[in-house]
């Protein structure tokens, strides 16, 4: 993760964006040179740039289960502590019982239509829907969920400017 990603600058008024694990993972695992290399998927590069802009504006948010996914499977204690320290700069959106219930409803709605997803994905959808905030993700499953759920996906180009 680049130094710009580790600190939040001026928190400007504006909509917060719930960032999915996939985007955080892309930004955290790439070295700055790799994030702009021609061999990198252009969508991934755009997502990393979008996250960087959201972080700079103080609008990037997460939920606890995303934090857990990011911290799970870290190979060394030092890497874990470093990542934990970076992520501590970002608040978790507090979750309520209604978020879990809505996530279960979303899971059932999508499953009835043949669309599968993870519990974390549906919790992200529920939190974003209930709070009327967009989701930033490179995971194509979210486009499928959007067909059946009241969620908004943030196009990468809308973040900048």
Q: Where are the model-predicted features located?
A:
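Short beta-strand->loop
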Residues: 150-158
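Short, polar loop motifs at secondary-structure junctions
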Residues: 77, 139-141
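Short, well-structured N-terminal submotif of metal-dependent ribonuclease cores
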Residues: 1-62, 72-85, 159-161
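A general structural signal for well-ordered alpha-helical segments in protein cores
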Residues: 48, 63, 67, 80-83, ...
């Amino acid at each position: 993760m680049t130094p710009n990603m580790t600190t939040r600058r001026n928190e400007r008024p504006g909509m917060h964006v719930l960032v999915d694990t996939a985007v955080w993972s892309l930004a955290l695992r790439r070295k700055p040179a790799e994030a702009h290399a021609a061999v990198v998927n252009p969508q991934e590069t755009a997502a990393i740039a979008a996250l960087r802009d959201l972080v700079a504006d103080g609008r990037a948010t997460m939920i606890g289960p995303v934090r857990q996914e990011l911290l799970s499977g870290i190979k060394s204690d030092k890497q874990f502590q470093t990542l934990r320290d970076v992520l501590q700069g970002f608040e978790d959106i507090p979750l309520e019982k209604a978020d879990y219930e809505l996530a279960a409803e979303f899971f059932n709605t999508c499953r009835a239509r043949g669309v599968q997803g993870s519990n974390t994905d549906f919790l992200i959808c529920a939190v974003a829907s209930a709070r009327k905030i967009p989701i930033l993700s490179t995971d194509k499953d979210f486009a499928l969920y959007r067909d059946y759920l009241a969620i908004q996906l943030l196009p990468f180009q809308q973040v900048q400017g």
